Amino acid sequence: MVNFSLGFFSITMRVVQKIAKLVDGTAWSSASNAYHRWRHPIDPQEIIKGIDSAGFAKIREKFSVPGERTHWPKYLDAGRWLPLNIRRAQELRLTARARPLRILDLGSGAGYFLLVARHLGHSGVGLDISEPPMYGELFELFGLKRMVWEINAYEPLPDLGERFDMVTAFSICFNAHKRSDLWSPKEWAFFLDDLEKRFLGPGGEIFLGMNPEEDGSFYTPALKQFFIERGAQVDRAKVWFKRVGG
């Protein structure tokens, strides 16, 4: 009886989740993204061919931790992380833009997203903290540009001397992720105002990929409402402001 009850509960929850997706539009978004990926495939091997294999091997030998899948050494597994960033680029429609975009990637990590973007004809700048040094060495190996900077609440970003068509931030941690001082709408308002006024060109876009907090949520109800009222399309972890620059 217990096994039957648990099985029934699991099925019921999946049905409820599917209905919720239909109601809030995420099912349509998922289907649209899947269709776009099918129409615009990207072969990760084509990107890997452009990487200096000997140089990458040296970095791997220097920083790798066998079996590590949680902390930063995991990003040395290009075969695992390139497909994820290809998917991100496809969902942002970087495969079907009318012209090359200039991209600012915040919390740029190992640089795989900008590497994929360059493969598609775009260019950009990464911004991240100095640690771990592996990130800087990978950026140099990939021939990508990076600014070292720590993002903090109520502090403007450094002047980069240019404006961008798109600002991205994936798996965000700079919002005091999993800390007691997690950003509220006030901190986000300062941050977004700074991006829009100083970094976005006309018709620019901002894409935020939120990290789940301790309770599994990506944002409080108040923060979600703030994003929506500011004009974002919100799809679970994804918060996309379109045509907000200028």
PLM region descriptions:
Residues 113-115, 135, 175-178, 214-219:
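Short catalytic/ligand-binding loop motif for oxyanion handling, primarily in non-cytosolic enzymes
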Residues 112, 118-145, 151-153:
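Class I SAM-dependent methyltransferase SAM/SAH-binding core
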Residues 214-246:
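Class I S-adenosyl-L-methionine
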Residues 157-166:
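A short acidic, Gly/Pro-enriched loop at the edge of an enzyme's catalytic core
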Residues 2-95, 208-210, 217-226:
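N-terminal accessory regions of S-adenosyl-L-methionine
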Residues 182-202:
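A short glycine-rich, Lys/Arg-flanked "PGG" loop and its adjoining helix->strand segment in the class I
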Residues 166-185:
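A short SAM/SAH-binding and catalytic strip from SAM-dependent methyltransferases
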Residues 100-109:
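Conserved class I S-adenosyl-L-methionine
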